[in-house]
A protein has these predicted regions:
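ATP-dependent small-molecule kinase catalytic core of the GHMP/sugar-kinase superfamily
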Residues: 1-10, 16-18, 24-29, 113-261, ...
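ATP-binding N-lobe of GHMP and related small-molecule kinases
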Residues: 1-90, 105-114, 125, 307-309, ...
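A structural signal for isolated positions on well-ordered beta-strands in alpha/beta enzyme cores
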Residues: 77-79, 273, 301
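DPxDG-like acidic metal-binding loop motif
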Residues: 90-114, 133-144
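Conserved glycine-rich beta-strand-loop-beta hairpin in the small C-terminal domain of fold type I
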Residues: 270
Length: 316
């Protein structure tokens, strides 16, 4: 008999802001940067039950995988209260897996780390950003994959300045590449030039990270835009351009000309993102964008960074 009533878990969405070395020319494959968002989130509650009760298919799949690996019972109820939208570039799969795994870890008192859980759920195979934001939140950098890497190590973590605001541009009619399509797309990409991997690594280390530390939004934005342009052009044969959605591309152009910085697409999209200083400025710009793009399937949302990781709460 458990001594608690339930386990509550919150897992944050994330922006995947790009890779550093897609071909491993510098000795390690991938290497990623990204940031945790205040919303959307995946939120679920786990309670004891006499049988398996899960209405969310993705959560059920994660439950079965976890319980088979650690030889614990699937007789629990998982209520998914909120879920990050699937296949739009916000990390829904990893965050659901980590939310279910972290909740069950607490429920059964297994003492597992977030990385143990991620490896069990086959997360972090290319990027460690989803793991990093669940662990710490904020802006994170992972070191990619070496010969013996299980999950990419976290190399850097910074809190995002409180006044920075992200504008998300979501195309409600489309999804980014995922599953087998994503795997095949990576296989079909041409080699990523070593000189570009060196340049992007330099820009991150000597420009983007100092810019966050010094609250220099303009400089940070320049680097992210350049990194996104470079990686987006490399991915363009697989996704039809730097942006997956032509409507998102048009909206990002409008936002750029009206003062937004750090222009990019998260993961395979179709969601675009940018940064701007201050709530009021961001909301005004979004209101203009909503009018201009009213006849498109676009949705605009202002969010802040989440400078803390996922939450696991034992309720008594």
């Amino acid at each position: 008999m458990t001594s608690f009533s339930s386990i509550s878990v919150i897992a944050p969405a994330r922006l995947h802001m790009g890779f550093l070395d897609l071909s491993g020319a510098l000795g390690r494959h991938f290497g990623s940067i990204g940031v945790a968002l205040s919303e959307p989130v995946t939120k679920l509650v786990i309670t004891s039950a006499k049988e398996k009760i899960v209405t969310n298919k993705r959560a059920e799949k994660c439950l079965i995988a976890f319980c088979e690996t650690f030889n614990v019972s699937t007789n629990v109820q998982i209520e998914v209260i909120e879920a990050i939208p699937e296949h739009v570039g916000l990390g829904s799969g990893t965050q659901m897996a980590l939310a279910v795994g972290a909740g069950l870890n607490a429920f059964y008192d297994l003492g597992l780390s977030v990385r143990d859980i991620a490896a069990t759920m086959d997360r972090g195979l290319r990027s460690g950003i989803g793991i990093g934001v669940f662990e710490q939140g904020g802006f994170v950098v992972d070191g990619g994959r070496g010969e013996n890497t299980i999950t990419p190590p976290m190399l850097a973590h910074f809190d995002i300045p409180e006044t920075w605001r992200f504008i998300l541009v979501l195309d409600q009619r489309g999804q980014g590449l995922h599953g087998q399509q994503e795997t095949q797309a990576f296989k079909n990409l041409p080699p990523f030039p070593r000189c570009e991997a060196e340049r992007l690594s330099y820009l991150l280390l000597m420009q983007a990270l100092p810019a966050i530390a010094e609250n220099n939004l303009g400089r940070f934005g320049e680097v992210i835009t350049e990194l996104q342009r470079t990686v987006g052009e490399h991915f363009s044969p697989a996704q039809g351009g730097v942006f997956t959605s032509i409507d998102v591309a048009a909206a990002m152009n409008f936002l750029t000309t009206n003062g937004a910085v750090a222009i990019g697409q998260t993961s395979w999209g179709p969601t675009g993102f940018c940064l701007i200083e201050g709530d009021e400025t961001a909301e005004k710009l979004v209101e203009q964008a909503k009018i201009i793009f009213a006849e498109t399937p676009l949705q605009f949302k202002v969010v802040s960074a989440r400078n803390r990781g996922g939450e696991v709460v034992v309720n008594f």
